[in-house]
Amino acid sequence: IGVVGVFEADPDGEQRMRVLLPVLGEDPGAVWARLAMPHAGTEHGFVFRPETGDEVIVGFLDGDPRQAVILGALYSSANAPAGDYAEASEENNDKGIVTRSGAKIGFVDADRPVVFIETPAGNRLLLDDDQEQLALTDQHGNSLILNADGIAVTSAADLAIEASGEVRISGQSIDLS
């Protein structure tokens, strides 16, 4: 087990990170370690670098200490998941990604799944099979809700509709008030 060190640019440009290895004693040595990802390639792939102080699992290619690889990160009592995901449950439905700033991509992995993207300020996109709706809401109280009842647009202040061409409104009944 290693601990990600303070950021230093990789002197060889190999996308490595400094990792302290406490197993080496009171003054743990640091190694440069490459970072394993589920998908990585030129100009594409996952990019989720651990933060300074995160616990990581370190392996060594062919047992060579010069070829360290961060294989994953670890949770513990001192390094718990973000609030919404801190408590495990038997159902294990709550999944997610939470960034350092609190931005979230979340999943409720139930029979009728829910997917959401949310910012710390309260802007949110919700895809909800349970409530059978798609909702876009913002921190100001504006919303766009699509569900079996139709489409509802709510503006906390003014509402402007602009088109470079024609605007057509049609329906069985139109109520403008």
Roles of regions detected by a PLM:
Residues 1-162, 167-170, 176:
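Structural signature for extended repeat/solenoid scaffolds and their inter-repeat hinge/linker regions
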